């Protein structure tokens, strides 16, 4: 069996879902499980209505909900026709009525908890999966809607819940396997899960990819397909560099580094369950299904190019901690990293010297609070509007003088930090955010003007 995950732009309207149904039909002989995201932009709209309700703006929240309701009704009606839509309409109506009730409740209580945000944020996938299942059935695909919250079990870390794989695997075997055995196509919402007590959670933004990998690993899928609106993983962001090339084959390790450092095609956590079970992951384009996309496997063919790709991660803050007397004291570095851990703030890059330690983190609203806690230990300063540029490729470890080659291509760039990853397959550095287009373009011209046809398209 295989898992096919379709992102928000792949299910953004009736025409897109119709395309998805045609793609799924081509794969029926492989016993697919289909995972769908919310309709494009709906999660943002849901978060906006939850914020409005939390701020006591009742009418604003309900107005956004009305717009979302209308969009889903129109999409379902266009897909199914009036008669079939009338069969699904009562269920959709009950779902949206429940959403409105929840929004009114938030306004009445005057409190918006992380638990409630998760309940509201995951609404899009609950509804899109029902609409997709109904559309498949009408197109002679024997589909069955499966509520992912009954299958994927997580802890109660609302906003970015952590899967409990053993319990999840057991529930998938109980719920999804019997449908596959009866030649049905299970249709599930991505991103959403629940605690073992049944409280709704989400897997973090972009978590539908993660859902697909969790389901694929739990059911020992032959492969996991991530369907997007691009032809696969590219040598860099085509918006920054129009001559970016498609990567045909890439290793799990290289893809994970790229996903972590800003390649938006893939959620960084997606690959972990797939790596553990050695399940290939394919990145494909629902608007161009004939394209072979990118294949991610444990080991990829050797490339004649040093690098596989260049990624840029914006909205980075550099935090400098200076402590002339304390830095080498026993346990001091541990104290620094505990501050970041307590704020649930992951660190990207680290650089140490005799008297200071510099780290990069994603820019967010908790930076000031982190700095205040660090100031109890040492002198602290931080600067935002930075970006990490990362070059990834397994040939890095066997190429001498790699840093010299990279930095001679961008001699006038203002570089704040340099790091070579412990994996030895990436070299990263920090620059000003507004320098990203120029730096990435020059690096791409230097390292990808000629490419290995076995690895790049």
Language model: regions and residue ranges:
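Nucleotide/pyrophosphate-binding catalytic subdomain
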Residues: 1-266, 271, 430-432, 451, ...
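Glycine-rich beta-alpha junction loops
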Residues: 39-40, 150, 230-232, 281, ...
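Short hydrophobic alpha-helical runs that function as membrane-insertion/retention elements
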Residues: 223-227, 281-283, 348
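A conserved active-site cap/scaffold subdomain adjacent to cofactor or substrate pockets
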Residues: 251-297, 302-322
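A conserved regulatory-domain signal marking ACT and ACT-like small-molecule sensing domains
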Residues: 290-457
């Amino acid at each position: 069996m295989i898992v096919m995950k379709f992102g928000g732009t792949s299910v953004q309207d009736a025409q897109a879902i119709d395309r998805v149904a045609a793609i799924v039909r081509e794969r029926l002989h492989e016993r697919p499980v289909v995972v769908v995201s919310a309709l494009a932009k709906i999660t943002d709209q849901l978060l906006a209505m939850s914020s409005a309700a939390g701020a006591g703006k009742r009418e604003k929240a309900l107005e956004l909900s009305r717009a979302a309701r209308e969009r889903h009704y129109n999409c379902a009606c266009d897909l199914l026709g009036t008669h079939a839509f009338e069969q699904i309409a009562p269920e959709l109506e009950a779902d949206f009525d429940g959403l409105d009730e929840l929004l009114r409740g938030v306004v009445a209580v005057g409190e918006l908890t992380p638990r409630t945000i998760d309940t509201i944020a995951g609404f899009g996938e609950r509804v899109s999966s029902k609409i997709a299942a109904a559309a498949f059935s009408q197109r002679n695909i024997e589909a069955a809607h499966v509520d992912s919250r009954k299958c994927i079990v997580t802890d109660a870390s609302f906003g970015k819940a952590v899967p409990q794989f053993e319990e999840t695997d057991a529930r998938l075997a109980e719920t999804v396997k019997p449908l596959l055995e009866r030649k049905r196509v299970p249709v599930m919402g991505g991103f959403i899960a629940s605690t073992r007590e049944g409280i709704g959670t989400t897997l973090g933004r972009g978590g539908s990819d993660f859902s697909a990998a969790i389901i694929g690993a739990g059911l020992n899928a032959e492969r996991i397909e991530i369907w997007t609106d691009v032809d696969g993983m590219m040598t860099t962001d085509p918006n920054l560099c129009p001559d970016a090339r498609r990567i045909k084959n890439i290793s799990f390790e290289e893809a994970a580094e790229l996903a972590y450092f800003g390649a938006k095609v893939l959620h960084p956590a997606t690959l972990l369950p797939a790596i553990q079970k050695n399940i290939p992951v394919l990145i494909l384009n629902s608007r161009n299904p004939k394209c072979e996309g990118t294949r991610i496997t444990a080991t990829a063919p050797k490339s004649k190019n040093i690098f596989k790709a260049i990624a840029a991660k914006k909205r980075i803050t550099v935090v400098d901690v200076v402590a002339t007397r304390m830095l080498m004291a026993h346990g001091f570095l541990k104290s620094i990293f505990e501050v970041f851990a307590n704020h649930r703030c992951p660190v990207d890059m680290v650089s140490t010297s005799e008297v200071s330690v510099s780290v990069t983190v994603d820019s967010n609203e908790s930076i000031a609070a982190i700095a205040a806690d660090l100031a109890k230990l040492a002198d602290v300063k931080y600067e935002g509007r930075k970006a990490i540029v990362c070059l990834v490729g397994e040939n890095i470890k066997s190429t001498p003088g790699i840093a010299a080659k990279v930095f001679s291509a961008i001699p006038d760039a203002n570089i704040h930090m340099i790091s070579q990853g412990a994996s030895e397959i990436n070299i990263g550095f920090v620059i000003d955010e507004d320098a990203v287009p120029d730096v990435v373009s020059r690096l791409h011209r230097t390292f990808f003007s000629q490419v290995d046809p076995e690895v790049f398209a």
